[in-house]
Amino acid sequence: MAYNSLIRIRDEDRKNRCTRLDIDMLKQIKIIAVEQDTSYNFLLEDGMRHALERFKGRHNVVIVKSNNRKTVNTTFSEDLYSRVQVRAERLGVNTNDLIEEGMRYIIGRNTKKDTE
């Protein structure tokens, strides 16, 4: 008999991925996740949605590439991750670069809240 968790309902759309992300930004995202009592994966997804909204055409793509990346196990919505992959390919950047742009947005959004 397979184990069925009663704590968290399994979402079949969410898939595990190994993703290379900036270590320092990931630490900040994890701190924000603890403060907001949520999973850092959900914050990463919020950032990915922002990146999809912001980077629609090549004219507004300014990507800051990180040299401080580490492979991290993440869990994302398969649909959302696929859309980010397609957008990154269309823009000529790495998927991880777009995810990190989303991380910058999440960090910036929460830093503004702290200073208000």
Q: Where in this protein do the model-derived segments appear?
A:
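Short, positively charged interaction helices/loops
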Residues: E53-L91, G108-E116
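Residue-level detection of beta-strand scaffold positions
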Residues: N16, D46-A51, T71, L80, ...
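Short amphipathic alpha-helical segments
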Residues: I29, T38-R49, V84, V93-R104
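Short Lys/Arg-rich basic patches
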Residues: M1-R20, A33, K56-F76
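General nucleic-acid-binding
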Residues: D13-E45
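Residue-level signal for short amphipathic helical patches enriched in basic/charged
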Residues: D24, E35, S39, T75, ...
